[in-house]
UniProtKB/Swiss-Prot annotation:
Its EC number is 1.1.1.25. Belongs to the shikimate dehydrogenase family. This is Shikimate dehydrogenase (NADP(+)). Homodimer. Pathway: Metabolic intermediate biosynthesis; chorismate biosynthesis; chorismate from D-erythrose 4-phosphate and phosphoenolpyruvate: step 4/7. The gene is aroE. NADP(+) binds at residues 121-125, 145-150, 201, 225. It is an enzyme of class 1 (oxidoreductase). It comes from Pyrobaculum neutrophilum (strain DSM 2338 / JCM 9278 / NBRC 100436 / V24Sta). Shikimate binds at residues 14-16, 60, 85, 100, 203.
């Protein structure tokens, strides 16, 4: 069986191949997972090949939203989110899921419940975090993005879809839970004072982002990019293989890949 992660600039940079190949070995599964760079314009071509050659694949920047329109089926939550990061290939059909959202909910949902949540970003990862916050019944949800119009459009879309208020803000506000749903790792994206949890999707080139270091300095609980990568990856393997993988094995492989 063959699996892959697709995106731009993933070959040699993504920890997913190391993580999944270590997991497959531990599970005794005869499978190989590779990273494939797929430019935007080549996505349809890749998907045609995937139908015949892969058992499943992960999707990362910049394809999480675009891939949805090319799939044969999409799980209800992924369709509501408007983004897919995990695809199962079954009988040459492509079925999409969003394990980013379920990973955020699993690792941060209890902190989001009844809390003010700030999400920085407006792409596929932000959509997943936003869905998790709404599912967890957060008290208030704010979206901040470098391009305010994108944050505003996303807030409006989710407010209409889920019949609850979602606020776009021109600059990050203080919140109980702060989520960095961007690749930014070397700059402060929000004020963490007063927060109880910080969630960061970034793990390249290191999960110890500037924001993670600040959260640790302030004594704030952290869910970092490695935690999220492992959880979404474990849930993806359950979809592909129908088994529960060992997250300890997966995390060890990621940390070794990153040289930590």
């Amino acid at each position: 069986m063959y699996f892959a992660v697709i995106g731009t600039h993933v070959r040699g940079k993504s920890a997913s191949p190391a993580m999944h190949n270590a997991s497959f070995k531990a599970l005794g599964v005869n499978a190989v997972y590779i990273a494939v760079d797929v430019p935007r314009e080549e996505l349809p071509c890749f998907l045609k090949l995937a139908r015949l050659n892969l058992r499943g694949f992960n999707v990362t920047i910049p394809h999480k939203e675009e891939v949805v329109k090319h799939l044969d089926g999409v799980a209800a939550d992924a369709r509501a989110i408007g983004a897919v990061n995990t695809v199962l290939v079954e009988r040459n059909l492509l079925v999409g899921y969003n394990t980013d959202a379920s990973a955020v909910y699993q690792l941060a949902g209890s902190h989001m419940r009844g809390a003010d949540v700030l999400i920085v970003g407006a792409g596929g990862a932000a959509r997943a975090a936003l869905f998790a916050a709404i599912k967890a019944e957060a008290r208030a949800v704010y979206i901040a993005n470098r391009t305010y119009e994108r944050a505003e459009a996303l807030a409006r879309e989710f407010a209409e879809k889920f019949k609850r208020e979602v606020k776009a803000v021109r600059s990050p506000v203080k919140a109980d839970v702060v989520v960095n749903a961007t690749p930014v790792y070397d700059a402060m994206v929000a004020d963490l004072s007063g927060a109880s949890l910080y969630v960061d999707f970034a793990y390249i080139p290191t999960p110890r982002t500037k924001m993670v270091e600040e959260a640790q300095r302030l004594g704030i609980k952290v869910v970092d990019g490695v935690d999220l990568l492992v959880e979404q990856g474990a849930q993806a393997e359950k979809i592909w293989l129908g088994v529960e993988p060992d997250r300890t094995v997966m995390k060890r492989a990621v940390l070794e890949f990153l040289g930590i």
